[in-house]
């Protein structure tokens, strides 16, 4: 079949009755989790660079808050020296090898009973340590019992110092039925836009979690974008028209993992059919945008990354 590229008007209606929809997602729920899901705000070790009112709202919308090692410094500094404010925004966990956590910040959060877990292994990243921890928190009563036992406080909460989190996680997954696990909405601040190798690693986690822990719904939020994975073989992205009109700009369909075929899109300014896309060839759908009145359909041969431009100063009114 020959490839096509169709330029659409700025607003079109999308009929979904004849579309083969394998997956559905709501754009706003990447930031405002569904109440039927477990949810986590993960702060990675980059400057927090979104408006404070938006940060406070996002914080309150998530069940669990986790700082990856030096990200605790970022949170501490973001709240300046306002102690009455800082005490309201204590993370549930700080985890990592703690090499980048300042002594002052460590003492502050330890004094305020934040659970701080040291993991010294250099064979996994702080991101992976955080993800294993988050899964254990929601899915392992044994882990929660360890954490709540005050007798374990002085011994790293009873968790082996090198890679205890990974050991506990691997043991848990031996009996975990993924299809019965409550989904975990995971919104990550940071991880994109700092050191390039760390940015690439962050992108790999979208693929890794989709393959190995599919109950996670990971999205990265930056001051300019939401970045997430679109599953292959037909995904419908739903959104409120006013939310789209006010908070959303351009988008890009990015074949970062591998070259693939966009079998069909419906609801983009430039829709395509049977369209090969590849970073190597330079055929990438960038600077596109949603024009479907309340949804967009994307059908690809393989999983693909989507970035969606956001206007962070407008988001607060829709959360």
UniProtKB/Swiss-Prot annotation:
Its EC number is 2.7.6.2. It catalyses: thiamine + ATP = thiamine diphosphate + AMP + H(+). The keyword 4Fe-4S does not apply. This is Thiamine pyrophosphokinase. It comes from the Eukaryota. The modification N-acetylserine is found at residue 2. Keywords: Acetylation, ATP-binding, Kinase, Nucleotide-binding, Transferase. Pathway: Cofactor biosynthesis; thiamine diphosphate biosynthesis; thiamine diphosphate from thiamine: step 1/1. GO terms for biological process: thiamine diphosphate biosynthetic process; thiamine metabolic process. Present with 3320 molecules/cell in log phase SD medium. InterPro entries: Thi_PPkinase, Thiamin_pyrophosphokinase_euk, Thiamin_PyroPKinase_B1-bd, TPK_B1-bd_sf, TPK_catalytic, TPK_catalytic_sf. The gene is THI80. GO terms for molecular function: ATP binding; kinase activity; thiamine binding; thiamine diphosphokinase activity. GO terms for cellular component: cytoplasm. Belongs to the thiamine pyrophosphokinase family. Homodimer. Essential protein, it is the only enzyme in yeast capable of synthesizing thiamine pyrophosphate (TPP). Induction: Expression requires the positive regulatory factors THI2 and THI3. Incompletely repressed by exogenous thiamine pyrophosphokinase. Pfam families: TPK_B1_binding, TPK_catalytic. It comes from Saccharomyces cerevisiae (strain ATCC 204508 / S288c) (Baker's yeast).
């Amino acid at each position: 079949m020959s490839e096509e590229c169709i330029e659409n008007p700025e607003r079109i209606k999308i009929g979904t009755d004849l579309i083969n929809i394998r997956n559905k997602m709501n754009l706003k729920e990447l930031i405002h989790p569904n109440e039927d899901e477990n949810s986590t705000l993960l702060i990675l070790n980059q400057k927090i660079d979104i408006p404070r009112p938006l940060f406070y709202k996002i914080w309150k919308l998530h069940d669990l808050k986790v700082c990856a090692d030096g990200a605790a410094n970022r949170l501490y500094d973001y709240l300046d020296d306002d102690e009455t404010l800082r005490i309201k925004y204590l993370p549930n966990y700080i985890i990592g090898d703690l090499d980048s956590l300042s002594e002052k910040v460590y003492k502050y959060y330890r004094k305020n009973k934040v659970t701080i877990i040291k993991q010294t292994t250099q064979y996994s990243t702080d991101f992976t340590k955080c993800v294993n921890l988050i899964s254990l928190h929601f899915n392992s009563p044994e882990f929660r019992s360890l954490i709540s036992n005050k007798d374990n406080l002085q011994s790293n909460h009873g968790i082996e110092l090198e890679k205890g989190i990974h050991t506990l996680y691997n043991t848990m997954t031996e009996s975990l039925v993924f299809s019965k696990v409550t989904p975990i909405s995971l919104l990550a601040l940071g991880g994109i836009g700092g050191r390039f190798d760390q940015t690439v690693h962050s992108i790999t986690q979208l693929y890794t979690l989709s393959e190995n822990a599919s109950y996670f719904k990971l999205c990265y939020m930056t001051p300019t974008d939401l970045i997430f994975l679109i599953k292959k073989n037909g995904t419908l992205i739903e959104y409120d028209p006013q939310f789209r009109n006010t908070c959303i700009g351009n988008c890009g369909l990015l074949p970062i993992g591998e070259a693939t075929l966009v079998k069909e899109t419906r609801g983009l300014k430039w829709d395509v059919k049977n369209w090969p896309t590849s970073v190597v060839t330079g055929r990438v759908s960038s600077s596109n945008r949603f024009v479907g009145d309340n949804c967009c359909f994307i059908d690809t041969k393989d999983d693909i990354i989507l970035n969606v431009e956001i206007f962070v100063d407008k988001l607060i009114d829709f959360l």
